[in-house]
Regions:
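Conserved ABC ATPase "signature" region
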Residues: 103, 112-127
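Catalytic Walker B motif of ABC-type/P-loop ATPase nucleotide-binding domains
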Residues: 156-160, 165
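Hydrophobic anchor residue at the start of the ABC signature
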Residues: 145
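Conserved ABC ATPase signature
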Residues: 131-138
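The feature captures the beta-strand-to-loop junction immediately N-terminal to the Walker
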Residues: 49-51
Length: 166
């Protein structure tokens, strides 16, 4: 099987306020991920399990290039195009429809996806002309999944994808 993602010694530390300093803006290294080695091959299904604060979301965000981690090339074009990311929560708001939102995102990603088919795939066919403000939390999760699927990514990273699903 083909390797689609490889990490070697990847680390990231969140910056937190340093209350021991007399400077109110001072920051220090907080929790994070340390020296992660990971290889994901095509067709692999991988789950991250651990207690709150273990670094699962941090690792997922690092994989997607949202953090500038040590030992990881965030600038890779592959990362932008070939990874679909579904965050734990997205605040879908606004006076546009589900269909308009997905069409706009597809345009930004320079992808000519069949939005109607994508809406059908994630179970939002009956909601395609509804405004984002009127969607339930479960419908918003489905919309996030649809966004992650735009571009037919080779790697799909989902952070608590079933949270709030109807």
């Amino acid at each position: 099987m083909e390797t689609i993602l490889s990490l070697s010694g990847v680390s990231w530390r969140h910056k937190v306020r340093d209350f021991s300093s007399w400077k109110p803006w001072a920051k220090r290294d907080g929790a994070g991920i340390y020296s992660v080695d990971l290889e994901i091959k095509s067709g692999t299904i991988l789950g991250l399990i651990g207690p709150n604060g273990a670094g699962k979301t941090t690792l997922m965000r690092a994989i997607c290039g949202l953090y500038d981690c040590e030992g990881f090339d965030k600038s890779s074009e592959t990362r932008r195009v070939e990874i679909g990311y579904m965050p734990e929560q997205v605040r879908w708001e606004g006076r546009i429809t589900v269909k308009q939102a997905l069409s706009s995102i597809a345009m930004m990603r320079e992808d000519s996806v069949d939005v109607g088919n994508l809406i059908q795939t994630v179970g939002l066919a009956s909601k395609s002309d509804q405004m984002l403000d009127s969607l339930s939390q479960g419908m918003r999760q489905r919309l996030s999944l649809a966004c992650a699927l735009i571009g037919k990514p080779r790697l799909l990273v989902m952070d608590e994808p079933l949270n709030g699903l109807d």
